[in-house]
C-alpha cells in the first residue's frame, strides 16, 4: 500500500524560480558539473531548471546533453532553458542512450570542475542539495560520492516508497541518479561506458 507524504505540492522544488539573495562572484570557476541527459523531456525540464537556479551553492555549470531528440517542441524548450543562465550549456549528439549521454556530458564538462552531479530531466533537488553534497565530500576526503534519500512524485502527489533492492546494484543502480561524485574517481573507473546497455 502506498504511503502518501503530507507535503504541500505547491511548494515542491522547482515549482517557482526564487530570487537569489547573494552576490555571485563572476570570476569564480565552476566547482560542480551537473549532467542531465535529455530526450524529448520538455514536460518537466523547466522545473528541473528552476530547482538548479534556486541553489544556495552558486558555483556550478549545468550541461544538458540532448540525446538526439526528434521532437521540435523539445528542441525549442532546450533553447529557452539555455537562455535562462550563462552557466547552462546544451550539447547535441546522436541518440545513444542515457549512459552514453552522461559519459558525453562528463567528457565535455569544464576541466576545472572537481565534482560531477547527475540529474535527470524530470528530477528536482532541494535548494541546499549542492551545498550539502559539496561540504559532505569536502569534509570527508576518503569518500568518493554523496547522495540523499528521494521522494517520488507522479505529477500530482508525493509518494514515499522503500523500493531499494541491493540485487539491482550492478545492472540498475538507482543511487547514482542524483549523486555527486568526485570527477577524478569517476573517470578512474571508466564512467558509464562499460555498462552502457544495462544502465538506467
Segments and roles (model prediction):
Residues 1-51:
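N-proximal low-complexity "stem/linker" segments adjacent to membrane-targeting elements
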Residues 44-46, 71-81, 124, 128:
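Acidic helix N-cap motif at the loop->helix transition within catalytic regions
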Residues 50-59:
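Short, acidic, metal-binding catalytic loop of nucleotide-sugar glycosyltransferases
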Residues 66-77, 96-97, 120:
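A conserved acidic beta->alpha catalytic loop
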Residues 93-111:
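Glycine-rich, basic loop-to-helix element that forms the pyrophosphate-binding segment
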Residues 112-124:
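Short beta-strand-to-loop acidic/aromatic patch adjacent to the donor-nucleotide binding site
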Residues 128-159:
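Conserved donor NDP-sugar-binding/catalytic core segment of glycosyltransferases
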Residues 161-200:
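Conserved nucleotide-sugar donor-binding catalytic segment
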Amino acid at each position: 500500500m502506498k504511503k502518501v507524504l503530507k507535503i504541500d505540492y505547491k511548494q515542491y522544488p522547482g515549482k517557482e524560480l526564487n530570487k537569489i539573495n547573494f552576490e555571485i562572484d563572476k570570476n569564480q570557476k565552476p566547482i560542480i558539473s551537473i549532467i542531465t541527459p535529455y530526450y524529448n523531456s520538455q514536460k518537466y525540464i523547466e522545473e528541473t531548471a528552476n530547482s538548479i537556479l534556486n541553489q544556495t551553492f552558486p558555483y556550478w555549470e549545468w550541461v544538458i546533453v540532448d540525446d538526439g531528440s526528434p521532437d521540435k517542441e523539445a528542441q525549442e524548450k532546450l533553447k529557452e532553458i539555455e537562455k535562462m543562465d550563462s552557466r547552462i550549456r546544451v550539447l547535441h549528439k546522436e541518440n545513444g542512450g542515457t549512459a552514453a549521454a552522461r559519459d558525453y556530458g562528463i567528457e565535455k564538462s569544464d576541466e576545472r570542475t572537481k565534482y560531477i552531479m547527475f540529474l535527470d530531466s524530470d528530477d528536482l533537488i532541494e535548494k541546499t542539495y549542492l551545498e550539502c553534497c559539496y561540504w559532505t565530500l569536502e569534509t570527508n576526503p576518503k569518500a568518493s560520492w554523496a547522495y540523499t534519500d528521494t521522494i517520488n512524485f507522479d505529477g500530482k502527489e508525493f509518494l514515499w516508497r522503500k523500493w531499494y533492492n541491493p540485487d539491482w546494484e550492478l545492472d540498475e543502480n538507482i543511487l547514482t541518479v542524483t549523486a555527486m561524485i568526485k570527477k577524478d574517481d569517476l573517470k578512474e573507473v571508466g564512467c558509464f561506458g562499460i555498462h552502457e546497455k544495462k544502465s538506467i
